[in-house]
From Swiss-Prot:
Protein name: Signal transduction histidine-protein kinase/phosphatase DegS
Main function: Member of the two-component regulatory system DegS/DegU, which plays an important role in the transition growth phase. Involved in the control of expression of different cellular functions, including production of degradative enzymes such as the neutral and alkaline proteases, flagellum formation and biofilm formation. Acts both as a protein kinase that undergoes autophosphorylation and subsequently transfers the phosphate to DegU, and as a protein phosphatase that dephosphorylates phospho-DegU.
First-listed, main subcellular location of the protein, grouped into a coarse class: cytoplasm
SUPFAM superfamilies linked: ATPase domain of HSP90 chaperone/DNA topoisomerase II/histidine kinase (SSF55874)
Domain Histidine kinase: 183-385
Length: 385
């Protein structure tokens, strides 16, 4: 008995050391990614300045070429007819031609240096982008490992007899959590974070605009900044809404789904989304677990269509009967090969998650998709769960 306790303590100690090492590695990878991201943003700003300088130098070089050509023509004319010009006029023509030629040579050298610097920055940005993507992927993978090592799956193990099934189930839950966290993180970084960074940069220019270009341009820049802040606020609200629509608790499935689809259509712009509801009233309510599950299923299906199908139209239909709720999502996109998608499970994770959610509700999900003919998904859930 004592030996068993001792073995358990030794194993716990080994596990804790391993977790600490893995967690430390995760922090180091994260720091590398953050440093690379900061350097990337600095280089992007420097690249913008270099490109502007290249443009200005090319413009100046073109002007100097014209002036140099005129000066050489003038010098040639003076040389051919030197008896008609004074010594001072000849000297001035020569000095001007020489000075312009020197300036042109220097500006051409400057252009060459700037172009080389621009090319070098673009190569470094590509390298940094690769480091950032790899660090994000590594952090995500390490987090999955940490969560799996930390998570107690004993209770789930009582429900799952097969050890392999238990492992797959646990990993799938953790991967789903990490995918969602990555999605939210990416949306915040690419949306509000970028917008606010832009606001910060532009706010630093306002004083210079007031000083150099006057109050009218300065006030216009403030107005533009205000619009940027509004856009950032809209993005934050949209992300919050995607995480958990508060209207779902207050209004129910149908009004919330209608609002979500309207907002999604407005946000994406190019895709037309139609919504139809059969056999319901606006204030009809379902049990909370049905409302949340059906909303998430519709959200996932629409999100998949927007990301992958390249469709121009999406139709969402909800039919509520006495015993069932039927959810149908159809798009006119490029479709996909169902057999191939099932074989590549890592590439059909969204559909796999939808299938598992439907199974929990004891429902059925059928998918009909053909390449070039779009996709049709029908989900049928019994209300007697």
């Amino acid at each position: 008995m004592n030996k068993t306790k001792m073995d358990s303590k030794v194993l716990d100690s080994i596990l804790m050391k391993m977790l600490k090492t893995v967690d430390g590695s995760k922090d180091e990878v994260f720091q590398i990614g953050e440093q690379s991201r900061q350097q990337y943003e600095q280089l992007v700003e420097e690249l913008k300045q270099i490109k502007q300088q290249v443009y200005e130098v090319i413009e100046l070089g073109d002007k100097l070429e014209v002036q140099t050509r005129h000066a050489r023509n003038r010098l040639s004319e003076v040389s051919r007819n030197f008896h008609r010009f004074s010594e001072e006029e000849i000297r001035n023509a020569y000095e001007k031609a020489h000075k312009l030629q020197v300036e042109l040579t220097m500006i051409q050298q400057r252009e060459k240096q700037l172009r080389e610097r621009r090319d070098d920055l673009e190569r470094r940005l590509l390298g940094l982008q690769e480091i950032i993507e790899r660090s994000e992927s590594l952090v995500s993978q390490i987090t999955v490992v940490l969560n799996y090592l930390n998570q107690d799956l004993r209770e789930v193990g009582l429900l799952l007899a097969d050890a392999q099934a238990k492992q797959d189930f646990g990993l799938r839950i953790i991967e789903a959590q990490e995918e969602e966290r990555k999605r939210v993180s990416r949306e915040i970084h690419d949306g509000p974070a970028q917008m606010l960074a832009n606001v910060m940069m532009r706010s630093e220019l306002i004083e210079r605009i007031f000083r150099d270009r006057g109050a009218e341009d300065g006030f216009q820049e403030i107005k533009n900044l205000r619009q940027n802040v509004r856009n950032a606020l809209y993005e934050v609200r949209r992300i919050i809404y995607d995480l958990r629509p508060m209207a779902l608790d207050d209004l129910g499935l149908i009004p919330t789904l209608r609002k979500y689809l309207y907002t999604t259509e407005e946000y994406n712009g190019k895709v037309k989304i139609h919504f139809q509801c059969i056999g319901e009233t606006e204030d009809q309510r379902l049990a909370p677990q049905f409302e949340v599950a059906l909303f998430r299923l519709a959200q996932e299906a629409v999100s998949n269509a927007l990301k992958h199908s390249e469709s121009e139209e999406i139709t969402v239909k909800v039919e509520i009967t006495k015993d069932f709720v039927i959810l149908m999502i159809k798009d006119n996109g490029k479709g996909f090969d169902l057999k191939e998608a099932k074989e590549k499970k890592n590439k059909s994770f969204g559909l796999l998650g939808m299938k598992e959610r439907v199974d929990l509700l004891e429902g059925t999900m059928t998918i009909d998709s053909k390449i070039g003919l779009g996709t049709f998904i029908m989900i049928k859930v019994p209300l007697s769960l």
